Amino acid sequence: MAELNTHVNVKEKIYAVRSVVPNKSNNEIVLVLQQFDFNVDKAVQAFVDGSAIQVLKEWSMTGKKKNNKRKRSKSKQHQGNKDAKDKGERPEVGPLQPQAPLVQNGHMNGCEKDSSSPDSAREKLALTPREKKISILEEPPRAQRGITEGSRLLQQKMSLDGNPKAIHGPSERSDGLQWSAGQPCNPSKPKAKTSPVKSNAPAAHLEIKPDELAKKRGPNIEKSVKDLQRCTVSLTRYRVMIKEEVDSSVKKIKAAFAELHNCIIDKEVSLMAEMDKVKEEAMDILTARQKKAEELKRLTDLASQMAEMQLAELRAEIKHFVSERKYDEELGKAARFSCDIEQLKAQILICGEITHPKNNYSSRTPCSSLLPLLNTHAVASGKQGNFSRKSSGHNKPNEGKAANPKMVSGLPSTADACQQTMPTNKQQNGPSNQRRRFNPQYHNRLNGPAKSQGSGNEADPMVKSNNRHEHRRQPHNGFRPKNKGGAKNQEAPLGTKAPEAPPHSEKARRRQHAADNLETRPFRGNVGRVSQCNLCPTRIEVSTEATVLSVPAVTLVA
């Protein structure tokens, strides 16, 4: 019962791992659990981190797992003791059989049937690497069979709850396990029983195959891809560095010129203050000279009272004062600002320096065998871009095509609108003429039904409507259209007559064309509609009030 509880615990651990990783098969979960000594947390962490893929690769590729030798030896010793007990109970399973690599209890390359003692396990571990390589090269199908049998063995462990025959004690279960472990080693046994399990094992093997093929196909290109990725990431970093350098340089430029500006302002302030001082000093000197001149002038006024010696002294003073007038002129020019602006501008222009980037990159011409691939990729990307543009641009012609029938179908409605607009304008402009004179068409309309009997009775409604339209198309004296020539040329084929025609001629024309109007009515209506559409743009500005006001005019005439 203890071993049964162990299997139940294994199944519960499988379910616990599957609840976290639902897209993994039972075989993969069991192999990873065996790798981590059925520790659920470590197995789940391995699936999450992706290290479970490497574990599964080690299970699928025989002879590659080199660690855990101590663990293997201990498990083999334990299995050897267990097999010795089984041999004592069932001696018929005793003969040795050829070994095949089998996945069992977390280690590889061992058939537990032969390991009757710990010495045999140690002998197996003492194989040289060369012998291991030879065994791997000579027996690849056996390795696959070992993986298949290992997965089948694990499935048997999981199905212990549903199989009542398996619960009879540890001896029978161990015999069943030994039989399943010994089956791939015996070539004479039939392989039909292992067919249901073989369908799952190659699938797991095929999942690992593309990665191995990719590694075998281009081990060097992976290093190049990593180098390219590092270089690409560094380009992004350098781009950020350029932006940072530009920002810092801009700040430095602003700071430098702000300092220059402050220096210039300070110099300007100092020069202005100095100029004020110069002005004040010059004014003081001139004021003193002015006082001296005033004093000499006052002395000259007193010259009549002076002695000869005093007059001589006064003349000498005046002569000295006058002789210094050249200094007065220099004093007037003393308040002058001078600056070598050109030299300063040249110094400012050469102030500051910016280093430009140097394009030291060299272009390498690709090999002739690589050019077709590059051209094909470029053409494919170009076609894809053009296809996306065309697909986005195909909607516009369809919209245009869809809009054309609407425009075509809108022509009759426009013609009808024009036809309705023209009579409205004529009725709006011509009620005064209709009230002033006798209109023979309305007179004939009132007397027509009594005179036309027999065959004329069928055509009377058409004739009335035709006369009504003809009267609406008839120009009046009060309305002068802008295109007189066009109106005359277009209304002449319609058979419209001037209102001065006598009544009997209008009656004769109506009787003559009464029968023809039944057949020619659609054609004439269309012609009239087109002709009115040609005149429509000049009369398109019609308000709703004009349409309402035109109705009483027709009613009054009728």
From Swiss-Prot:
Keywords: Acetylation, Coiled coil, Cytoplasm, Nucleus, Phosphoprotein
Positions where Phosphoserine occurs in the chain: S120, S455
Compartment annotation: Cytoplasm; Nucleus, Nucleolus
Main location as per UniProt: cytoplasm
Modified residues (N-acetylalanine): A2
Any one GO cellular component localisation term in the record: nucleolus
Bias (Basic residues) ranges: 63-79, 469-485
Family: Belongs to the SPATS2 family.
Protein known as: SPATS2-like protein
Species name: Rattus norvegicus (Rat)
